[in-house]
Amino acid sequence: MPAEVHGSPPASLCPCQSVKFRPGLPEMALLTALDDTLPEEAQGPGRRMILLSTPSQSDALRACFERNLYPGIATKEELAQGIDIPEPRVQIWFQNERSCQLRQHRRQSRPWPGRRDPQKGRRKRTAITGSQTALLLRAFEKDRFPGIAAREELARETGLPESRIQIWFQNRRARHRGQSGRAPTQASIRCNAAPIG
């Protein structure tokens, strides 16, 4: 028979979850959507059952979470079997915990360990003006594969770094792949035509 819970909420409930702890319930209790101890917003048909876990289950979940924020299915199944909680509930616990931690990290403006910081190690996007684009387009019409000398000359004319010129040509060739200076095919004309109707 499970022990009675007294005092504070189980550790498995993240502080940012909206479910309120209700003293007097067994530690491992499934609350149904029809349970009148649930808050009004959690009552009603179609709501999932809420799983309150024992301290030992919470400790096991937390220990696993601290080792790996994104455990694989085999790990989750093994953990679920070991602590006697259905695997889908373990999956949801991990999703909720990651979400809660992410919100806390955002509030404290610290980088989230589960994701790469998009600003770190990323070069700022180069803004290319209309006149620079016009110069590059004229050069592209003459030669789609300019050598280093031609790219350096374009860099002097546009004020852009040669490496950006090289990337611009790569991107432009990728956009125009398959046409290679030929007249556009009927298929490409149909694809680029404005929708009718």
Swiss-Prot record:
| A Pfam cross-reference name | Homeodomain
Q: Tell me which residues form the DNA-binding region.
A: 46-105, 121-180
Keywords from the named record: DNA-binding, Homeobox, Nucleus, Repeat
InterPro entries the UniProt entry points to:
HD, Homeobox_CS, Homeobox_regulator, Homeodomain-like_sf, HTH_motif
Record's GO cellular component terms = nucleus
- Say which domain of life the source belongs to: Eukaryota
Calcium recorded as keyword: no
PROSITE patterns this protein is in?
HOMEOBOX_1, HOMEOBOX_2
Where does this chain mainly localize?
Answer: nucleus
One GO biological process term: regulation of transcription by RNA polymerase II
> What residue spans carry the region label Disordered?
101-127
An example Gene Ontology molecular-function term: DNA-binding transcription factor activity, RNA polymerase II-specific
Annotated tissue distribution: Expressed in hepatoma Hep3B cells.
Q: Which CDD domains match?
A: homeodomain
Where, per UniProt, does this protein localize? Nucleus
Q: What else is known?
A: DUX genes are present in 3.3-kilobase elements, a tandem repeat family scattered in the genome found on the short arms of all acrocentric chromosomes as well as on several other chromosomes. May be functional despite lack of introns and a poly(A) addition signal.
Family the entry assigns: Belongs to the paired homeobox family.
Protein name, per record? Double homeobox protein 5
